[in-house]
């Protein structure tokens, strides 16, 4: 059909008609809110590079989680900030560690889906995501420590564990550890295609996890690559991942679509700290209106993400 028989504007003539033919819808069910929890009590500490985000003590986190649950939030992703760091990241798998305490209380006090970040970078003296020997991040030895972290989170009550380290074979190691200990129903949401991105800087500042030497390019993915992402995702699925993830989201919308179209499995995308801070800065400077938040998240959903991890969740959960 050609003009004038086909007029595309007919389906745009008012908001109700536009809603009827809308192809992509953003829902509260899509959102996961990443939170930072630290030792102490009655602490809610501003994060300078992430306006509107905070480091919470456990009691403050519980209060915030309850408020967000009342507004319709369904899921939360917990990142710990320990008091003590060492070369093995032992605070990460301490049964009385900050994440473990938070998970127990979140499960007692809320009905939220509780997801935990499984990594070592916040917990090690050197800030890398694995065990370091002679300034090299050793892969296979790291796996047993990551498995211990995941198991400790499952024992605390986590619904989902989310390995973010990008070590080869970590999903298999974690799945085997969970199965061996009777946690066969704990979900693994793997950071499958996690790129070595410059958009992580505000997060690293928030959790004090910048590497003491070098960078993470020997284990995180190289930004120019897309077919490599498919190999990473397939390996994680084969090793037992239930949900796969692309991180960051906005510079990698093509990867989200590629992963979703290729595998058709539940796919998460992480709208990371740098994306958040960049948009917040533009809004705060009146360069953009806050309408760009919804537009941004819609682009991630439209690209194929089933789940969106975003620091914007508290701002928009009541809007959608």
From Swiss-Prot:
Active site location: 194, 247
GO annotations of cellular component type: cytosol
Names of the cofactor(s): Zn(2+)
One MF annotation (Gene Ontology) recorded for this entry: zinc ion binding
Binding-site residues for Zn(2+), renumbered to this chain: 119, 121, 129
Keyword Coiled coil: no
Residues bound to 5-aminolevulinate 2: 273
PROSITE patterns in the record: D_ALA_DEHYDRATASE
Catalysis: reaction(s): 2 5-aminolevulinate = porphobilinogen + 2 H2O + H(+)
Stated role: Catalyzes an early step in the biosynthesis of tetrapyrroles. Binds two molecules of 5-aminolevulinate per subunit, each at a distinct site, and catalyzes their condensation to form porphobilinogen.
Record's subunit section: Homooctamer.
Protein name (database record): Delta-aminolevulinic acid dehydratase
Source organism of this protein record: Methanothermus sociabilis
The gene coding this protein: hemB
């Amino acid at each position: 059909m050609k003009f004038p028989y086909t007029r595309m504007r007919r389906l745009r003539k008012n908001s109700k008609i536009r809603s009827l033919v809308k192809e992509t819808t953003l829902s509260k069910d899509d959102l996961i809110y990443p939170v930072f929890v630290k030792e102490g009590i009655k602490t809610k500490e501003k994060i300078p590079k992430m306006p509107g985000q905070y480091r919470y003590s456990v009691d403050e986190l519980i209060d915030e989680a309850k408020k967000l649950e009342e507004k319709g939030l369904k899921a939360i992703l917990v990142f710990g900030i320990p008091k003590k760091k060492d070369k093995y990241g032992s605070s990460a798998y301490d049964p009385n560690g900050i994440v473990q305490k938070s998970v127990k209380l979140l499960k007692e006090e809320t009905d939220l889906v509780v997801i935990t970040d499984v990594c070592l970078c916040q917990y090690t003296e050197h800030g890398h995501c694995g065990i370091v020997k002679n300034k090299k991040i050793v892969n296979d030895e790291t796996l047993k420590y990551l498995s211990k972290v995941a198991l400790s989170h499952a024992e605390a009550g986590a619904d989902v564990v989310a390995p973010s380290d990008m070590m080869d074979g970590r999903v298999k190691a974690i799945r085997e550890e969970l199965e061996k200990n009777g946690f066969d129903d704990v979900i693994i949401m793997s950071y499958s295609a996690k790129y070595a991105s410059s958009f992580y800087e505000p997060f690293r500042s928030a959790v004090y996890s910048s590497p003491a030497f070098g960078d993470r390019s020997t284990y995180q993915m190289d930004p120019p690559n897309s077919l490599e992402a498919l190999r990473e995702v397939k390996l994680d699925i084969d090793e037992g991942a239930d949900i796969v993830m692309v991180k960051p989201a906005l510079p990698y919308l093509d990867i989200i679509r590629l992963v979703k179209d290729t595998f058709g499995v539940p796919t998460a995308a992480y709208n990371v700290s740098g994306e958040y801070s960049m948009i917040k800065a533009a809004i705060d400077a009146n360069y953009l209106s806050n309408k760009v938040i919804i537009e941004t998240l819609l682009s991630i959903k439209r690209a194929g993400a089933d789940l969106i991890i975003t620091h914007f969740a508290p701002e928009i959960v009541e809007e959608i």
